[in-house]
């Protein structure tokens, strides 16, 4: 029995309470993948073998197998960062335990050291933050261009939660650098939703063109009332033609990269998703409020658990 087959068998046997597997077809039709049932209640076993995919090599990964602080591959955003969100980002809300990265949203009051009385800047005008959380990024350690990215995670779905798996380009100003949202969960059109998006530059500074997929959360809970209690597998397949985003092998959005050229501000007519100048780094965060809605205080603390992050690239 060859080594790759042994690795795949080991991975299949170690996925929590998972027992089945499903054959799915790769987006370019060139190979078949055996994917484990990702909807188990537990993370994968510590130090389980990472599966191989035909035609791909594992370029980067974090299995979160070592309890304590996240590895030095990750850096942290600090304080109030974006979108008028309620949380104060800080390192100590992120830990690794029992084979998972755990980002905890807390209802706690912390002073804003940057407070300026009378300021019109939302980041400065708040004397306190009423919530805390963490946002981790590989901006200083890893970025990639084309490939397959997988994240197995269990997300909080209480009102006010805004968990995300996303990427930003490592050059140019937003949104000309290109944003990829593999996962966002928040209130959209008055109802909880799972989103899979990308955006790029429009004609004005900080103006974005969005390709947005919005799937009502009820779509998932109608099939499994315990959906929010389980881990799920988010995947992005990205090449020079398309970007395809999945959850548990269900296609959420397929974006034609012929349509994603910046519209004329800086980086005029560049395409952030196919440009050889650009790579994208990873962010994992749990925002509170903002698009997430008014937080349900009774649901705190909130836990966003990430079993692993894996990036594969074609040979």
Question: Model-flagged regions — what are they?
Answer:
Residues 1-7:
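Sec-dependent signal peptide recognition
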Residues 12-14:
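C-terminal motif of bacterial Sec signal peptides marking the signal peptidase cleavage site
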């Amino acid at each position: 029995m060859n080594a790759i087959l042994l690795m795949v068998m080991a991975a299949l046997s170690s996925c929590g309470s998972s027992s089945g597997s499903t054959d799915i077809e790769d987006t370019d039709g060139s190979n078949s993948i055996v994917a484990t049932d990702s909807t188990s209640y537990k993370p994968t076993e510590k130090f389980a073998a990472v599966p191989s995919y035909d035609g791909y090599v594992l370029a980067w990964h974090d299995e979160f197998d070592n309890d304590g602080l996240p590895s030095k591959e990750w850096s942290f955003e600090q304080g109030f960062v974006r979108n008028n969100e309620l949380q104060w980002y800080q390192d100590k809300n992120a830990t690794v335990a029992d084979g998972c990265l755990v980002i905890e949203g807390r209802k706690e009051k912390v002073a804003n050291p940057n407070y300026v009385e009378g300021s019109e800047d939302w980041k400065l005008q708040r004397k306190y933050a009423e919530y805390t959380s963490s946002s981790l990024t590989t901006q200083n350690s890893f970025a990639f261009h084309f490939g397959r990215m997988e994240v197995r995670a269990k997300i909080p779905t209480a009102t006010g939660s805004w968990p995300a798996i996303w990427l930003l380009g490592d050059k140019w100003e937003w949104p000309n650098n290109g944003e990829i949202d593999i996962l966002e969960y928040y209130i959209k059109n008055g109802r909880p939703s799972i989103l899979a998006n990308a955006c790029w530059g429009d004609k004005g500074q900080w103006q974005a063109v969005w390709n947005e997929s919005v799937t009502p959360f009820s779509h998932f809970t109608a099939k499994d009332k315990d959906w929010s209690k389980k881990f799920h597998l988010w995947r992005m397949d990205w090449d020079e033609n398309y970007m395809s985003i999945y959850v548990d092998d269900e296609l959420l959005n397929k974006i034609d990269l012929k349509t994603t050229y910046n519209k004329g501000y800086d980086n005029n007519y560049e395409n952030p998703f196919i440009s050889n100048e650009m790579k994208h780094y990873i962010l994992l965060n749990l925002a509170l409020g903002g698009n997430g809605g008014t937080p349900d205080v009774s649901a705190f603390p909130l836990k966003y658990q990430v079993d692993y992050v894996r990036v594969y690239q074609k040979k």
